[in-house]
Amino acid sequence: MQRLFLLVAVMLLSGCLTAPPKEAARPTLMPRAQSYKDLTHLPAPTGKIFVSVYNIQDETGQFKPYPASNFSTAVPQSATAMLVTALKDSRWFIPLERQGLQNLLNERKIIRAAQENGTVAINNRIPLQSLTAANIMVEGSIIGYESNVKSGGVGARYFGIGADTQYQLDQIAVNLRVVNVSTGEILSSVNTSKTILSYEVQAGVFRFIDYQRLLEGEVGYTSNEPVMLCLMSAIETGVIFLINDGIDRGLWDLQNKAELQNDILVKYRHMSVPPES
């Protein structure tokens, strides 16, 4: 009877856990958070604004903890590409290529040289237009990455049978600011942050079921929220705040004035007051 009880207990504990995947997942589009849905459902502007983004730097100086790698940064170095994508997805801005500007200029030189020599391809015979200048620049940086901001757990064990769970919260922070190209004035600035959740669940049994017979078993899994997705969400949230702030300051306007009370704009307007630490 005792053995049966132990066997049932182990089966119940293991049933609470997720089985490991049997095969690798297929390539797919990057998952997105609620901030992406809010960003893509903003009301339309009076007109789209030409914007340039040069480089969003990592100013945290943080590296992945041992034993990962002492030379791998704790946050992704692709914030510039993420910001360009967020600006385009908002349908409020027309991003201009600036990160790969030198590559673009080289291609234009090649086309002009071919046009002068008369060896240009059919699709490049039309004279090149001048590059479009931006109305504003969006600058910024990753200003903070704090690990183990909060951690905790809970567990229980009875006669060698038990389970426990632990969690840890990290935090990443981003600064974005809008700069007037004509004057260099900073028109708007915002700081956003996103927590990164990691947790672990374990269950096991360790008990002698008979003389010189030991029953021992462990099951468990861990889940780590991708830093890349959290950084993308923080940037998308920052873009929404910049758009909302620009509407309030009269920097740009809505196509339909009645959309000023749009649910998304109202929600982020209420969130514009930073919470107490």
Regions found by a protein language model. Give the residues of each.
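N-terminal segment of the mature soluble domain
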Residues: 49-50, 54-148, 171-188
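Short, low-complexity, polar/charged sequence segments that are solvent-exposed and flexible
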Residues: 70-75, 114-117, 156-162, 195-198, ...
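Extracellular loop and loop/strand-boundary signature of outer-membrane beta-barrel proteins
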Residues: 125-126, 160-164
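C-terminal motif of bacterial Sec signal peptides marking the signal peptidase cleavage site
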Residues: 12-15
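C-terminal/domain-edge helix-coil "capping" segments
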Residues: 17-48, 146, 154, 166-277
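Charged, amphipathic alpha-helical segments
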Residues: 143-160
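Sec-dependent signal peptide recognition
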Residues: 2-7
